[in-house]
Amino acid sequence: MPVIDESTMTYAEACRYFPGGVNSPIRACLPVRIVPPIVSSACRDIFIDSFGNNFIDFCGSWGSLIHGHSHPKILDAICNAASHGTSYGLTSENEISLASTLFSCLDLEDYKLRFVSSGTEATMTAVRLACGVTKCSIIVKFLGCYHGHADVLLKGISVDENNLQNVAHIVDTYFAGQPCLPLTLILPYNDVMIFEEVMHQIGERVACVIFEPICINMGVILPKHGFIESILAMCRRYSALSIMDEVVTGFRMGIRGMRSIMDVTADITVYGKILGGGMPVAALLAHQNIMDHLLPLGTVFQAGTLSGNPVAMAAGKASIELCCEPNFYSKLENLTEGFLSPIEEIIRSKGFPVSLVRSGSMFSFFFRDTPPANLSEVQQCDQERFGLFYRQAFSLGVYLSPASTEASFISSVHSRENLAYTQNVLIDSLVKSFDNV
């Protein structure tokens, strides 16, 4: 059992140097009220904190580590690349090699991509590119979907049934006072009626609609039938660009991502996380007619000293090649199914008001009777009981993503022994969470 109290000392030291003791806010674990572990090392499906406590990891660097920690092939690629230089400030062979591997896997012709260092950079660039291509400046996104911390994708004007009929007036008023600034409209996820009404009113002025094909940052939320199809159809009708954010889902459920799972293709697709194999890599990809609007061929600006870093590119290629191995995704699916099915059965048999939602190797526990369809329903979950459940599991060495609004992940290297142990821990934690409230 982890010695949780000792970690307070190390976390207090981290707080001397970093705001909240972290360099990304969710790592502070505030939603579940635990002292965040400080990691010393990690291998396969285990990380070890600074006091030697072992944790079975179901966060996996927020979905990046589909191959687990310290995979030998990825480590070898990193070490070999670093021995030739860590950064060039020029196009490298490793960039071309990873791009070639990607296009072969994705089976795309007449497409181009641009590598960047983070999902935020990729989505920010995708939106800027869409505005440059369409000469429009309205961005549509959906409440609860996270696309990085660029202002244009964090803030905006919310649209719901209360102000739906006044969208055109809201837009006109905004641009009258701030004619040069983009406007972001935030709509409810999974609401086709509201989305289509907004597009009917102002669709010709919309630069892009950005969406997650499966929501991850309010927990795993599946799209309702017809929702994604409506987004793509309305974008085509009004000549807006669709941007599919696959920073998390890309290469998680299949080598071709949601293009093959849902049979949908957006104008621009954004990748990250698994693409880097644990290193900082992201990319945006689109037909060359769109991508060639970027400098130096076009007028849309994007730049980055570490974009296409040769060491990160080598790690990314190794990660993608591992994903391409025979039966990789079917094995991962079977591993996840075998792990979660007994937990689902206990939830049903005991009548717990808990929805265990999964898609591929991603899963979330929602403490409510039915799976939520949007952020409003997520916020109705029993957060207090989720916290009890989480802290009990954590005390026994199981590390889920530390918020009810975050997904957890299975990797290809989770051992059956650790999964069996975690099954028992999660079932016991569920039972105790309902005994203690």
Curated annotation (Swiss-Prot):
Protein's cellular compartments: Cytoplasm
Modification sites for N6-(pyridoxal phosphate)lysine: 273
Pfam family, one: Aminotran_3
Transmembrane segments: none
EC number of the protein: 5.4.3.8
Pathway assigned to this chain's UniProt record: Porphyrin-containing compound metabolism; protoporphyrin-IX biosynthesis; 5-aminolevulinate from L-glutamyl-tRNA(Glu): step 2/2
Keyword Cytoplasm attached: yes
Superkingdom: Bacteria
GO BP terms in the entry: protoporphyrinogen IX biosynthetic process
Record text on subunit structure and interactions: Homodimer.
Full protein name: Glutamate-1-semialdehyde 2,1-aminomutase
Organism ancestry: Bacteria, Pseudomonadati, Chlamydiota, Chlamydiia, Chlamydiales
